[in-house]
Amino acid sequence: MAVEGRPPTPKSILRGHKAQVHAATFIRNNERLVTGDADGFVIAWDLTIMRPRAVWQAHDNAILGIAGWGNDRIITHGRDNKLIVWKLIGDDEARMSTTLPLDPCAEPRPKPWILHLLEVNTMNFCSFSYCPVSAPVLPGQQEGQSQDTAQESRFESELLIAVPNTLASEAIDIFHLPSQTRRHTVKLGDKNGMVMAVALFNQADSLTLVAGYENGLAIVAHRDPVKNDWVPLYQATCHSQPILSLSVSPARDFFLTSSADAVIAKHPLPSVVSQDTTSTHATTTQAAQVSESEESSSPVNTGDKAVGKSLLGAALAKEKQNPSSQPKRSLKPEEVLTHPLKTVNTKHAGQQSIEIRSDGLIFATAGWDSKIRVYSTKTLKEVAVLKWHQVGCYAVAFAHIAPNTGAPSINDQNPKATVSTTGTQPATSDSLGHGTQKPNMDQSLTVVPKLVELTVRDKRLRQAKAAHWLAAGSKDGKVSLWDVF
């Protein structure tokens, strides 16, 4: 943590890359930081000891992007026209090399198992984006299982990948994994230049694509499932130079763009206005409202059978249980928006990378002037400047912040309080298995053995997962790791 009145300093400096670092991401609940350089090397850093756990050359050219897929897969995108999905679990790291690219290595470094390989276009210098396949609530879905749970399980097995089109540099291809088939080709204009940055995600039960172009234009488009076409919802040109990076807020209510110029723009993400494709469904909806009013005035259920329920209400209830019988909704957006929410001239040209933290409060940029700048997402005001590197920075990444971690850093927390609130206490359960709590005196006594049982490894792991890491990759091949917010 930075001391008041003194400039912040990095928590750690990770030295190992021989070439400039182009990509970085946190995986496995912040246990690992994965970085990629201009020579195609990938390093998986163990943040409990700040040492490499796996080093291999993933591509024959520069790394454009890295992302984690679940806890056992890593996606890398290189300028050798390849996008590769690697399988790397904890047990696999034991056979991997830990010899850094800086150190000479006589023998070739072993590589993880390749699960999927896509031939893609990398002439744009545009990294990929990914999202889970949309998971609607199925008729056979168990009661109480939320759509988020279904989508999370779908994310473990299926994925959509967005990359620039192989032939037309202004178009975007969307591939499906694991089938490795192309699902969509999206072309949102002819005179915008190359695609420079993309983001793909699900919003309002529809697939949403955000694209930044060479002429400084940013576009948001939704896919209409009925027309099988992409409908623009927003477009604005806020930059005089090519867009270098974009980041979508976790709440899916806005996105940010940075460029080779000094402008940072905050753009809206319009919501989709749904409209039923048939008047029959509209009539059914009105009938459902009438049925609900009838049910509210009907007698209370007695036993296992409802008394006084209308036949229409029973039919509609059955229809609700089978969503597939309802017609698809056509997405009818309103007028295309053309004005950003806010723009700011930072006076610092060339903000290569931009990323919003998972809590949506702040975002950071990596600048060509070697500085990492932190801004407020609400006001776009600069709140911190992190200076350590002597040359330009090309990559920035935030660790995932758990919703219940409100403290600025693990260093400011009381270790005893942490253990007492997060540790399990089986001694406090009664004979029936109910989670009753003992008095405060007994509760304080159970804290001491918990502290003793924690090993050094456990403490480091707890600290690595709870820290609010900010990683920055630079042209000098070094990665600075900060914990300041």
Swiss-Prot record:
Its main location: nucleus. One of its GO terms (cellular component) is nucleus. InterPro entries: WD40/YVTN_repeat-like_dom_sf, WD40_repeat_CS, WD40_repeat_dom_sf, WD40_rpt. It comes from the Eukaryota. Residues 406-431 have a biased composition (Polar residues). Keywords: Chromatin regulator, Nucleus, Repeat, WD repeat. GO terms for biological process: chromatin organization. This is ASTRA-associated protein 1. The lineage of its organism: Eukaryota, Fungi, Dikarya, Ascomycota, Pezizomycotina.
